[in-house]
């Protein structure tokens, strides 16, 4: 009975996480962690470690799918990733020096609002319009935004994927598919860094839960990424919006339960 319960919890947690990753480049940690903590009474630090390692393969497979469909900006993604990773470390160092405030709720609420934005005001930028920005200007924008995202993520410990998507589409004028593709590409490496450091500090995870989460998240992320790359922009905006709104509401519900 306990095994069946574990399988069900990990399946639904990973389904939400995989769909969020494949459609919107959202971090699996936002969905998987609260469910593992609430239902399986797992240590929060370990739950985040498991969620981040589920994120690594799911993001990598999504990034590969977006890349195959020419919806990934690798060169600029690498520039942004360097500044995000550097300042995540700075942010978490600063956070360790100030009294801890739980800011996780902020990133969940942002997920919900971002979902509503995609439904009401779809991102209809084209790839042609994206190419209109000079390479130097784009590089500077990416470094500045990367510093901001990295610092906030390190400080709060959450919200990376959503902030990247918001900034890539709203500030940097990326077309939606390319924004998600670039976001999951960066998330692959940020999640890997996070997962390794969690397990080095917190010890080995519950291997059954870890394995189930990794496999299920990978499966759902692949399904979502394939659909997202075939969908028309308007349909994709709506689908992404609905996934984000539902996940935002569900996670807020779990946060109230705990």
List each language-model region with its residue ranges.
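Short, structured loop/turn "capping" segments at alpha-beta junctions
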Residues: 126-127, 158-163, 174-178
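Membrane-interface alpha-helices at helix entry/exit sites of multi-pass transporters
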Residues: 42-50, 75-76, 173-184
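Transmembrane helix-bundle signature of multi-pass membrane transporters/permeases
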Residues: 18, 48-56, 180-191, 244
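Hydrophobic, membrane-facing alpha-helical anchors
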Residues: 1-6, 53-64, 159-168
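Transmembrane helix boundary and interhelical junction motifs in multipass membrane proteins
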Residues: 23-32, 157-167
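A small-residue-rich subset of transmembrane alpha-helices
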Residues: 54, 182-198, 208-221
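Juxtamembrane transmembrane-helix boundary motif
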Residues: 1-19, 31-39, 44, 65-151, ...
């Amino acid at each position: 009975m306990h095994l069946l319960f574990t399988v069900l919890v990990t399946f639904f947690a990973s389904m939400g996480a995989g769909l969020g990753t494949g459609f919107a480049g959202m971090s699996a940690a936002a969905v998987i962690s609260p469910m593992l903590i609430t239902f399986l009474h797992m240590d929060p630090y370990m739950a985040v470690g498991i969620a981040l390692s589920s994120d690594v393969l799911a993001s990598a497979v999504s990034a590969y799918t977006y890349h195959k469909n020419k919806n990934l900006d690798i060169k600029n993604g690498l520039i942004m990733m360097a500044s995000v990773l550097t300042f995540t470390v700075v942010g978490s160092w600063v956070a360790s020096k100030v009294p801890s405030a739980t800011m996780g709720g902020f990133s969940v609420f942002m997920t919900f609002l971002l979902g509503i934005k995609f439904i009401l005001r779809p991102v209809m930028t084209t790839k042609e319009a994206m190419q209109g920005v000079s390479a130097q200007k784009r590089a500077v924008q990416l470094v500045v935004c990367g510093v901001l995202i990295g610092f906030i993520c390190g400080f709060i410990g959450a919200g990376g994927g959503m902030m990247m998507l918001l900034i890539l589409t709203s500030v940097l004028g990326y077309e939606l598919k390319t924004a998600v593709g670039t976001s999951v590409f960066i998330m692959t490496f940020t999640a890997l860094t996070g997962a390794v450091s969690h397990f080095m500090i917190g010890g080995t995870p519950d291997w059954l839960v870890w394995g189930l989460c990794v496999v299920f998240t990978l499966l759902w992320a692949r399904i979502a990424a394939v659909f997202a790359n075939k969908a028309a922009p308007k349909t994709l905006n709506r689908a992404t919006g609905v996934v984000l709104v539902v996940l935002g509401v569900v996670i807020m519900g779990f946060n109230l339960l705990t």
